Regions:
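Histidine-rich, glycine-flanked metal-binding segment
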Residues: 1-50
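Divalent metal-coordination and catalytic microenvironments
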Residues: 9, 24, 45, 56, ...
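Metal-associated gating/positioning segment near the N- to mid-region
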Residues: 46-111
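Active-site mouth loops of central-metabolism enzymes
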Residues: 55-68, 89, 117-130, 151, ...
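A glycine-rich helix N-cap at a beta->alpha junction
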Residues: 106-122
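Histidine/acidic residue-rich metal-binding segments in metalloenzymes
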Residues: 131-300
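His/Asp/Glu-enriched, well-ordered alpha-helical/loop segment
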Residues: 197-225, 272, 293, 298-300, ...
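C-terminal cap of metal-dependent C-N hydrolases
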Residues: 315-318, 371-426
């Protein structure tokens, strides 16, 4: 088995250390480690993190391979420093059976760029009428533990209660896309001053907050786990904070774009800024940053949502909702959280690797950078500055809101069980 010596990297942003990888495992961490026959990476000034874990990725396969495949999506993930992603169920066919989740799991194994853990649908066809085969998906080769109808809300309270009760039996979690559909019919952007001035249908904060309030109470009643996808409002932060103070088993995620962008960008009518939940106000952005810093929000998740060119290069009302995010997430977090002093690099490792791995049960991921642990690692150059060029993306889609924007940081190397998937910033 080959050996690699990472020399002089700041492990989790701490003091410079050497890390010796032997095969799939970290063999030694310390200073002055002799290289021997190992390949040496000079990493002075760089940050070494555990491989990132994304709890919310849309890989689109099966069914929408025109926008992404498991292969292209995992290549994008590796480029962004990820060693594991959780693939959402809103594919065609929907991942609501053991057969479909096993197909996605197998495709992930074949890609080799990062581990893929399928997320199972909560309801058949994401229609909210009948529970999907939760037990069968859990017992399948994919071993599904996270279930979500993401893209749609499990808006029926009885259905949500039944789902929470069912997954409690095997320690699963329901990841809720919090959106009361009757309050968002025809919505095109955040409801507020900008939507009123532009004459666009508004997506009110209460449509998210009312579902979160209901579901944390249901989770408390059932004694089960609920995870809130892409939390986006200051009010949602307060509800989750209250729920945690009561000991309710709730976790929450925020996307990079909700940490940086606001609804003011919609004035351009550029559909690249159309996303669900929508970009909110500056007040919401600041509340989300503070909540991620203090732990009210547990993790950063990309909600990587690729779309083909024709679904975004059109008028606003006809455009699809969603943004790609795997290849820019870490840079946005560096800008919004590290360079503002809200998180250090150890905090980034916690929010983007340790905690998502625990929530999703990603075995071998989100582990300490120490001897005997799996060598799932990400090396980052924080001093790098560069404009985002989607033409260089590994993703099949280019719908990024950051095109031409200068962002800090660059993933130079990614290791999946000791094998380099990214070398010097390029896919291996």
């Amino acid at each position: 088995m080959s050996k690699t010596l990472i020399r002089g990297a700041k492990v989790l942003g701490g003091e410079p250390q050497d890390v010796l990888i032997d095969g799939a495992t970290v063999e030694r961490v310390g200073t002055g480690i002799e290289a021997g026959d190992a390949t040496v990476i000079e990493a002075q000034g760089q940050i070494l993190l555990p491989g990132l874990v994304d709890l919310h990725t849309h890989l689109r396969e099966p069914g929408r391979e025109d926008s992404e495949t498991v292969l292209t999506g995992t290549r994008a993930a590796a480029s962004g420093g990820y060693t594991a992603v959780f693939a959402m169920a809103n594919t065609f066919p929907v991942a609501d059976t053991a057969g479909v989740v096993e197909q996605v799991y197998r495709l992930g194994k074949e890609s080799g760029y990062c581990d893929v853990q399928p997320i199972g649908a909560v309801t058949v066809g994401l229609e909210g009428k009948k529970l999907a085969e939760l037990g069968a998906m859990h017992e399948s080769a994919a071993g599904v533990t996270v279930f979500s109808d993401d893209g749609k809300c499990v808006d029926d309270a009885v259905m949500m209660r039944r789902a929470l009760e069912y997954v409690k039996a095997f320690g699963g979690v329901i990841a809720q896309h919090a959106q009361e559909p009757r309050l968002t019919e025809g919505a095109q952007m955040n409801e507020g001053i900008v939507s009123a001035e532009l004459g666009l249908g508004g997506w009110p904060a209460v449509a998210e907050e009312s579902i979160i309030a209901r579901d944390v109470l249901l989770a408390e009643h059932v004694g089960s786990r609920v995870h809130i996808c892409h939390l986006s409002t200051a009010g949602s932060v307060e509800i989750v904070r209250w729920a945690k103070s009561r000991g309710i088993d709730v976790t929450a995620e925020v996307t990079p774009h909700h940490l940086l962008l606001t609804d003011e960008l919609v004035r351009s009518y550029n559909p690249v800024y159309k996303v669900n939940p929508p970009l909110r106000t500056e007040r919401d952005v600041m509340a989300l940053r503070e909540a991620l810093a203090d732990g009210t929000i547990d993790i950063v998740a990309t909600d990587h949502a690729p779309h083909p060119h024709e679904d975004k290069d059109c008028e606003w009302a006809a455009a699809a909702m969603g943004m790609v995010g795997l290849e820019t997430a870490l840079s946005v977090v560096q800008q919004t959280m590290v360079e503002t002093g809200l998180l250090d690099w150890a905090g980034v490792a916690d929010r983007m690797s340790f905690r998502p791995a625990v929530i999703g049960g990603a075995k071998g991921h989100g582990r300490p950078v120490s001897a005997g642990e799996p060598a799932n690692l990400t090396l980052v150059d924080p001093a790098y500055r560069g404009a985002v060029d989607p033409a260089g993306f590994a993703s099949r889609s280019r719908n990024t809101p950051y095109e031409g924007r200068e962002l800090p940081g660059r993933v130079t190397h990614t290791f999946l069980r000791g094998r380099a998937t990214v070398v010097d910033g390029k896919l291996a």
